[in-house]
Amino acid sequence: MKFPNLLSLGVAASTTVLAAVPNQKPIGDTIEDVHLGKFLIELGPGDTRWVTEEEKWGLRRDGRRFFDITAEAEQNVFPRTFAQTTVTFPTELQNLAHVKKLASSLSKNRLQTFLTKFTSFYTRYYKSESGRQSAIWLFEQIEKTIQESSATEARVEKFEHPWGQFSIIATIPGQTNKTVVVGAHQDSINLLMPSILAAPGADDDGSGTATILEALRVLLKSEAVAQGKAPNTVEFHWYSAEEAGLLGSQAVFAQYKQDNRDVKSMLQQDMTGYSKGTMNAGHADSVGIITDFVDEGLTNFIKKVVTGYCGISYVLTKCGYACSDHASASRYGYPSAFVIESKFEYSSKLIHTTRDEVSSLDFDHMLQHAKMTLGLVYELAFADL
């Protein structure tokens, strides 16, 4: 996500922290090597430039977001030419009683226990050894979640990348190949010195990672879903390398487009745990529904989901171009949406620093995001899309 002013946070690197951390040597990036350390980025429609990796981080420190489209340049792929999929979303919620019963099983304690471990990895930087190890641990948790359910056909797979950290895709097959996707990004970053400094990434995006995992666990308690009786297939994605220009999610949706996958919707959950900004501004707790660079029909349906399934309301807000992984789905023609923890200006200023820790999070607020995720996925799994 965006980057706060480091100086205002008083984030100064100590001499002990600046020392190289064992097992943090960056893992090679073959795409970077081809272009002698240069990357092609897109900061807006048609606004592209070649930059070094340090220039990428400099742009991020200045609050600029972008797609890293180096792979597109290599493959002569032009996603802006892809037709946008048109989907008619439901006008009303159809499963209120059943979903609310399921939602009673969502657990704040599980969210906190998961995040305490997930943030203990020194960094989840996508080219670090600890970033690879965190992905391995996350994969094991997802695998365990599926194994403990009755969903015998559900599966989890690694989506490999040229860098060290893989993306993860969990699939619950339905009656058709029409697919409903929920995503979060698993990587973290300290933008001061990405390959050296700690990046616990509790809110960005440990919170989203935990939120959708908990939603998956409870969704699998539905016998109809677990036994593959839903009309539509459901997927949960945990992307690598979001912080470096949406690299992991771009690779996933590029592959899906190549394979003619029928993705009907994609919801991104990035930063779901920080409520202090809203409270300190004197406003009631709420979730932030993004309205720019998203699918209008899906976004309007999400408003209904929040109203029907959450104990708090929503505010409308904007986050700009390429601000999280939903943008990759949209880039390849799939309807996408994004729900964040608050109005954008009230979101956490601790992200991308050593201070993005579990202690800053509101697990009651995260539970609301889990309810929204569960409600949306269940409704769309059984919808005529």
UniProtKB/Swiss-Prot annotation:
Gene Ontology BP terms: proteolysis
Record has ATP-binding as a keyword: no
Residue sites binding Zn(2+) 1 per the record: H185, D204, D270
UniProtKB keywords: Aminopeptidase, Disulfide bond, Glycoprotein, Hydrolase, Metal-binding, Protease, Secreted, Signal, Zinc, Zymogen
Listed cofactors: Zn(2+)
Molecular-function GO term, any one: metalloexopeptidase activity
Enzyme Commission (EC) number: 3.4.11.-
Short name of any one Pfam family annotated for the protein: Peptidase_M28
Propeptide: 20-87
Broadest EC class assigned to this enzyme: hydrolase
Binding locations of Zn(2+) 2: D204, E243, H352
Leader peptide range in chain numbering: 1-19
Cofactor note: Binds 2 Zn(2+) ions per subunit.
Glycosylation sites: N177
Gene Ontology cellular component terms for the protein in this record: extracellular region
Gene3D superfamilies: Zn peptidases
The organism's place on the tree of life at top rank: Eukaryota
Subcellular compartments: Secreted
Disulfide bonds: C319-C323
Family (UniProt): Belongs to the peptidase M28 family. M28E subfamily.
Subunit and partners: Monomer.
Physiological role: Extracellular aminopeptidase that allows assimilation of proteinaceous substrates.
Protein's name in the database: Leucine aminopeptidase 1
Organism: Ajellomyces capsulatus (strain H143)
